[in-house]
Amino acid sequence: GLLVDRNGFPLQVGCFEGNKAEKATIIPIVTAFAARHSIEGMVVVADAGMLSAANLRELDEAGLRFIVGSRVTKAPIDLASHFRWHGDAFTDGQVIDTLTPRRGRNTDNDPALRAEPVWEPGEHDGSWRAVWAYSAKRAARDSRTLTLQANRAKAVVAGEKAARTPRFVKTSNGARTLDEASLARARRLEGLKGYVTNIPVEVMPAGEVI
């Protein structure tokens, strides 16, 4: 396990069994470093796949802060209020500060309310803070990627390309068809990037989280 600062400078190295995933090594590496140097107020930043729900809980219980990339598939849940009141409309640079369930779904973020809830640790113990940002540049890149994936799926469905079942292809009774519903859902989320954190807004505004 390798712990680095924001500039990539190595801070600590740890050795683990070769079959141990990063999700199982990051907590002991971080907590050992914090204990060794008597660090308080440390913020762990990681990609979406680096930390599990259990990891986030353990970091929080250890008194550590975190900012973790969120999977775009979480957007429909986190942004349910936005989609209900504003549809698919986003502006370049728009930021939405809201909540995300720690597990599954909960009622902390009520889509019936137009205003996004402000995360409070003591009040929303079933949720984390979620910050979502929209970028027109990212949307254009996502659109190109989805178009390529859709074209690949259409080629497989038409029998023009032999391959294992790609994204946006569904198989029913041995027949392959284009999964138009999944493609439409993916198109709806173009340009969005999310972050999950346990840092209150009064400590770190959304712009700094991003």
Which role fits each region the language model picked out?
Residues 1-210:
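Anion-binding and metal-coordination hotspots
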